[in-house]
């Protein structure tokens, strides 16, 4: 069976597999204590962010991570289908099938999606960054963004390998068409640019159409008289 991924998967496995397989140690996940009239309540930081409609994608993308992201998206839609959802991305990429599951869910649900690159959005991470709603995709000033073509491995009989190679090519064309749709670039240019790793700084990503803005500082709220 073909193993199709969007590159950097070996980096993702090296950096994050231990945390994903064993679970991030509770001692490494900050807890937020909130006090109300009913006493104190503790939240892990990711649950607290979710209450603010913020999803943080900070690992490589595999089926487990995708399942968590999709569940959060669907939950937030059920909570309020009219309010935006914010996805902060710091990811080296990973599985194409897992990433497309996240992508389809982003397109399916009613809330608009704001995406922000914080650190790095490479391969499938860059694809998801560009998949936010037009005008609501951004990057912090020193992030790095990279696009390239999917890679894959196949084994088995020669006929099976041929079938799998065709499937990889179909996936590649699909991703190129979707990226062209979200960036406004011609499909031919996307294919040419993704033949090899194409790294961009935020300004280059802005000009390419992967993002719509570069965030340097949150605006200071106006003081009320």
UniProtKB/Swiss-Prot annotation:
Main location: cytoplasm
Location of this chain's protein in the cell: Cytoplasm
Keyword Transport included in the entry's annotation: no
CDD domains in alphabetical order: S14_ClpP_2
EC number: 3.4.21.92
An annotated GO BP: protein quality control for misfolded or incompletely synthesized proteins
Active site: 123, 148
Catalytic EC class: hydrolase
Keywords, comma-separated and alphabetical: Cytoplasm, Hydrolase, Protease, Serine protease
Catalytic activity: Hydrolysis of proteins to small peptides in the presence of ATP and magnesium. alpha-casein is the usual test substrate. In the absence of ATP, only oligopeptides shorter than five residues are hydrolyzed (such as succinyl-Leu-Tyr-|-NHMec, and Leu-Tyr-Leu-|-Tyr-Trp, in which cleavage of the -Tyr-|-Leu- and -Tyr-|-Trp bonds also occurs)
Gene3D superfamilies listed in its UniProt record: 2-enoyl-CoA Hydratase, Chain A, domain 1 (3.90.226.10)
Gene Ontology terms for molecular function: ATP-dependent peptidase activity; ATPase binding; serine-type endopeptidase activity
Record's GO cellular component terms: cytoplasm; endopeptidase Clp complex
Free-text function comment from the UniProt entry: Cleaves peptides in various proteins in a process that requires ATP hydrolysis. Has a chymotrypsin-like activity. Plays a major role in the degradation of misfolded proteins.
Family that this chain belongs to: Belongs to the peptidase S14 family.
Quaternary structure note: Fourteen ClpP subunits assemble into 2 heptameric rings which stack back to back to give a disk-like structure with a central cavity, resembling the structure of eukaryotic proteasomes.
Protein name per UniProt: ATP-dependent Clp protease proteolytic subunit
Taxonomic source organism: Chlorobium chlorochromatii (strain CaD3)
């Amino acid at each position: 069976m073909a193993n199709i991924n969007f590159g950097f998967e070996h980096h993702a496995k090296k950096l994050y597999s231990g945390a994903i397989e064993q679970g991030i140690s509770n001692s490494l996940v900050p807890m937020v204590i909130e006090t109300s009239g009913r006493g104190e309540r503790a939240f892990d930081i990711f649950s607290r962010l979710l209450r603010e409609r913020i999803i943080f994608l900070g690992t490589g993308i595999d089926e487990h991570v995708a399942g968590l992201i999709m569940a959060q998206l669907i939950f937030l839609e059920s909570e309020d289908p009219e309010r935006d959802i914010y996805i902060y991305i710091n990811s080296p990429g990973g599985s194409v099938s897992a990433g497309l599951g996240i992508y389809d869910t982003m397109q399916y649900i009613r809330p608009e999606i704001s995406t922000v690159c914080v650190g790095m959005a490479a391969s499938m991470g860059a694809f998801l960054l560009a998949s936010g709603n037009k005008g609501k995709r951004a990057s912090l000033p020193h992030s790095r963004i990279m696009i390239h073509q999917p890679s894959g491995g196949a084994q088995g009989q020669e006929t099976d390998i041929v079938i799998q190679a065709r499937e990889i090519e179909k996936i590649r064309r699909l991703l190129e068409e979707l990226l062209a749709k979200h960036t406004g670039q011609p499909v031919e240019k996307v294919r040419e640019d993704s033949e090899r790793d194409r790294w961009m700084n935020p300004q280059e990503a802005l000009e390419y159409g992967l993002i719509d803005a570069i965030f340097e500082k949150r605006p200071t709220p106006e003081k009320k008289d």
